[in-house]
A protein has these predicted regions:
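Amphipathic alpha-helical interface segments
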Residues: 1-105, 127-144
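Histidine-centered, metal-coordinating catalytic motifs and their short helical/loop contexts
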Residues: 96-124
């Protein structure tokens, strides 16, 4: 493996690590928000931290699974696309159609709520579940 390819894989792995750290920290804090934000008036500082963490998680997941144009996208660092897809869908126990539907929810969340403010999506959309993203990230990490 050449140095450039190794660096590309390392960059993608770094995105997966940041995703994992952010989403797990979010879950750890989200479970005790009422306690942490007690006595802070209208500031709700830990709720703000949680919002930043879930946004960071969505952004970093999308760096590996979002747009093919990203240098850190799995298609740019894994040569056997069909082999990875097969492995991913088997590990997640999902179909390509189901994963694409999830991918669409996650990328729309990132684009319409996190990266840009789309008022219509913000009021009508919902935050996607992150268990699938966690499993996909772990699968990509294992495969790389």
């Amino acid at each position: 493996m050449d140095v450039e390819k190794a660096q590309a894989i390392e960059n993608s792995m770094m995105c997966l690590t940041i995703f994992s750290r952010s989403i797990h920290t979010f879950f750890a804090l989200a479970n005790v928000l009422g306690h942490l934000d007690r006595g802070t008036g209208d500031l709700f500082p830990f709720r703000g931290v949680c919002n930043a963490l879930i946004g960071d998680a969505a952004i970093h997941w999308c760096k590996v699974f979002g747009s093919d144009a990203e240098a850190t996208h799995w298609k740019c660092v894994i040569d056997d696309h069909d082999g990875f897809r097969k492995f991913l869908f088997e590990e997640l126990r999902t179909t390509p159609t189901e994963f694409h539907a999830y991918w669409k929810k996650m990328t729309e969340f990132r684009s319409n709520v996190i990266a840009h403010f789309n008022a219509e999506h913000f009021s009508n959309g919902s935050t996607p579940e992150f268990d699938t993203a966690i499993a996909a990230a772990a699968t990509a990490h294992k495969y790389m």
